[in-house]
Amino acid sequence: MTHPSDTGPAPVLALEDISKSFGAVRALRDVSLELFPGEVHALAGENGAGKSTLIKTLAGVHRPDAGQVLLDGRPTVFHGPADARDAGIAVIYQEPTLFPDLSIAENIYMGRRPRRSFGRIDHKATRAATAALMRRLGVELDPERPARGLSIADQQIVEIAKALSFDARVLIMDEPTAALTGSEVARLFGVVRTLREQGAAVLFISHRLEEIFQICQRVTTLRDGALISSEPLDGMTEDDLVRRMVGRDLDELYPKQEVRAGEVAMSVRRLTREGVFTDVSFDVRRGEIVGLAGLVGAGRTEVARAVFGIDRWDAGEVEVEGRRLTNGAPSTAMAAGLALVPEDRRAQGLVMNMSIERNIGLTGLRTTVRAGLVDRGAERSRSLDWAAKLQVKYARIADAVSTLSGGNQQKVVLAKWLATGPRVLIVDEPTRGIDVGTKAEVHRLLSALAADGVAVLMISSDLPEILGMADRVLVMHEGRVTAEIPRSEATEESVMAAATGRAAA
């Protein structure tokens, strides 16, 4: 492996022919990687490709079975994360772990705050050092501000500042934008560019291909634990990268089947929850995919939760197949044929320490319970059937769902609800945090469900997904529906205009 410039700097950190196995599973096979100062390097691959194992090897969590880690060209062994940190390597995860009741400065210098005479903490010096870090990153954050209440984006910036306080030269950013808005992503990318200009090496992991092309100069692609390529992004297209990641050409990423919409399956009228959303009305017809777009905080998820009965509403009504739903009663919604795949699959859609088969079987207990006992045979048969239909990849159906990749966890949530035979399916951010191959599978599934007559309400912050999959687009802004746009007229510009309150319904 060589740097694109023969006269360029030597790699600050490199992996050379790294292999790592867990039992009989080979997570990495002879993988090499070079990270250069002043460069943002993407790590691409589907879930299960080996990205997490590679990151943990760089961070000192895992020791390789074969191969070596090179720091400034010299072989080195990390006996733990502390060794990697002392070597100038830091990992920024998508969910920061700050102490909420401590200030930004206290979080950054936890256990390392400057001392004055007699061992007293020098608060002034701590604040000054924190302010200097923020200036270096080109951001304005008050060092004395508590971490509680910071946005995810600001928390990540604090984590980056903390890494720099340890003189980090290599920053590994693992899905840093997954929970960020467009403006927050832009701000974070500004910080990343500043780091690059200051000579840091950044390893950037994201399922959002457009971000890789926007911020990175090179990309290393893994597939099934093996190195596929490591090359400049100049001249490469998203389709090229997808082929390297999945080993094949994807049939359309948005395989929307044209279906004639049928009768109204779900009707929402003047739904209001004080201080959250107001006077929300819309219909979803059989065979139709309706996209619900809007910025973070617009009220989309809150409407879905109220419609399903998780949260109560103050005014309005919801009907499914002509049957009025009881306010605040999910059991009534389920009995009417409504299913909800929630936004946070780990916290709301799955019981992580429970098996795959039990998770899929949770919604079918009414049919698998006999004389007060669960018929395990019936539950297993049902779970195996749905896992096969959705092509869930697992070792054993009895394994904990926590052992699955994010994409396969999402398939389990979908299987759990599709097993109920829903007439109306609400999916909230159905492809967030999953790889491009699984994303295409989910899109094909939603399209097939609509073709079979299921009414689908799809909430998504991914505009290309909304435009590619929806027959109609509803847009919310500050708790109100501000536009309803047919597929033929929906563009990024028209949706964003309504999402920012610049268009009227």
UniProtKB/Swiss-Prot annotation:
Enzyme category, top tier: translocase
UniProt key word Phosphoprotein: no
Entry keywords, A to Z: ATP-binding, Cell membrane, Membrane, Nucleotide-binding, Repeat, Sugar transport, Translocase, Transport
Organism: Streptomyces avermitilis (strain ATCC 31267 / DSM 46492 / JCM 5070 / NBRC 14893 / NCIMB 12804 / NRRL 8165 / MA-4680)
Taxonomic classification: Bacteria, Bacillati, Actinomycetota, Actinomycetes, Kitasatosporales
Cross-referenced InterPro entries: AAA+_ATPase, ABC_carbohydrate_import_ATPase, ABC_transporter-like_ATP-bd, ABC_transporter-like_CS, P-loop_NTPase
Location of the protein in the cell: Cell membrane
UniProt cross-references to Pfam families, sorted A to Z: ABC_tran (PF00005)
Catalytic reaction annotation: D-ribose(out) + ATP + H2O = D-ribose(in) + ADP + phosphate + H(+)
Name this protein carries in UniProt: Ribose import ATP-binding protein RbsA 2
